[in-house]
Amino acid sequence: MFIYDTKLKQKVPFEPLVQNKANIYVCGPTVYDDAHLGHARSAIAFDLLRRTLELSGYEVMLVRNFTDIDDKIINKALKENKSIQELSSIYIESYTRDLNALNVKKPSLEPKASEYLDAMVGMIETLLEKNIAYQVSNGDIYLDTSKDKDYGSLSVHNSSIEFGRIGLVQEKRLEQDFVLWKSYKGDNDVGFDSPLGKGRPGWHIECSSMVFETLALTNTPYQIDIHAGGADLLFPHHENEACQTRCAFGVELAKYWMHNGFVNINNEKMSKSLGNSFFVKDALKNYDGEILRNYLLGVHYRSVLNFNEEDLLVSKKRLDKIYRLKQRVLGTLGGINPNFKKEILECMQDDLNVSKALSVLESMLSSTNEKLDQNPKNKALKGEILANLKFIEELLGIGFKDPSAYFQLGVSESEKQEIENKIEERKRAKERKDFLKADSIREELLKQKIALMDTPQGTIWEKFF
């Protein structure tokens, strides 16, 4: 298994800290709004990583957090006259619904930052004791990055423009010094009583503490195998996580760092500041979650994905082929490449090379259908074919529906009954040899985007886009 390590900037063999086990921490959302396609892409990318590792024989522990203490949450909660707990719980539920619709496997653990305040305070106390952290006059506590000789080694970022994003404070020793603890500033602020005084943790200390509490190994030079997240988190978030972990514990946070690429909308980076965010819940109004998942996984996870509906509909054809084959093999069977599972898994073991994996999948679908055409009555390989289709489901998280349910997505029960009535009416017209009437019914349904297919078992139908 090979993965691309952001820190080394190259593909490297995956060699876990504990044989046949993989510990992964994925930075989850700050829960002050609904999930957008960038959140969905990150979740799907590392869901693919997890599935690939599991099918390669690893026991995977994947933790994805919720940041439920943050300035954005506080500001929105104040604006909407809610507590931060009320607001964050709304968006945690929304995020969970969206990811369930995208068939993302539930993490092993989903810690909330608010549940690990003691660990955060303890880590900050350690940094103060080591004289690596310092307090300014308003009570805020910062980490002195000059004490970490390896600061910047992950992101190779030293741009003053980037440091400007962090915000300049007059008493900070260096521009890149980052806040560990924000002291309580009075009304409209949120604070928790602690040995550090009343206040709340900074963003970066939250994730490091949760890694340490949920996944960290003892007596190793690294705390976990893989730390993952979106490319936008590389700096300053992941750089600062790595820094404070070295300073507090004398170890590296992760052996490997993985980052997924951005989602662009009309060739422009998707962001709330640009007003072009595309929420998952809105996309799900137009497309089934499996169709959306199939599209988002179709571009290599490290590449930028330029979202557009034309490409989404093109990618849906791949999903159609999977279900078309599944539909055929459930009744009529033929042969399939016996090395298919090995070949497609090897593609995914090469830094999640999904493009190559999908090429192997396309080849399998094509060759299997050809064999079915040549020998439609061969049932000897039914188990093998269905097992390979099941493998696609487990590896890529697609192809798990019943074919009839997939091809009839977006059709209500009352509409289904009307279609079945029309099919029965058409059948009677053909029995009377009233072929004009039969053709008119077919044309009528086509206008409703319903295609009819006559098979030896009877007429079946499907909805098209």
UniProtKB/Swiss-Prot annotation:
GO terms for molecular function: ATP binding; cysteine-tRNA ligase activity; zinc ion binding. GO terms for cellular component: cytoplasm; cytosol. Its EC number is 6.1.1.16. One of its GO terms (biological process) is cysteinyl-tRNA aminoacylation. A motif ('KMSKS' region) lies at residues 269-273. It comes from the Bacteria. CDD domains: CysRS_core. Belongs to the class-I aminoacyl-tRNA synthetase family. This is Cysteine--tRNA ligase. It comes from Helicobacter pylori (strain ATCC 700392 / 26695). The gene is cysS.
